[in-house]
Curated annotation (Swiss-Prot):
It comes from Prochlorococcus marinus (strain SARG / CCMP1375 / SS120). This is Small ribosomal subunit protein uS13. The gene is rpsM. HAMAP family: Ribosomal_uS13. It comes from the Bacteria. SUPFAM superfamilies: S13-like H2TH domain.
Amino acid sequence: MARIAGIDLPRDKRVEIALTYIYGIGLTRAQNILAKTGVNPDIRVKDLEDGDVQKLRAATESFTIEGDLRRQEGMALKRLQDIGCLRGRRHRMSLPVRGQRTRTNARTRRGSRKTVAGRKK
């Protein structure tokens, strides 16, 4: 089983798709990595040779992925909250950050409805 950046890639998937299981690598970046390393994107992970896995591992080390990327994003959110800007306050209150309306809708961000007594008209 191929293990890259601490993630076990699914054996029966194509390499191009399996690389997207790594946090921080999407389809476009996976295609770029495969083009740079010269690995066939249509081959299955179980059919990869050790040399190919080493090439992929070396190519992914140049990117910020997995734990480092999660930590970096978390620190960016924490910085916004610490400086007290509008985006940081909206993140802290679990409200939409980018100017969407909240009188109605915004259910994904705000969570399920909380019934308030006496709100019936």
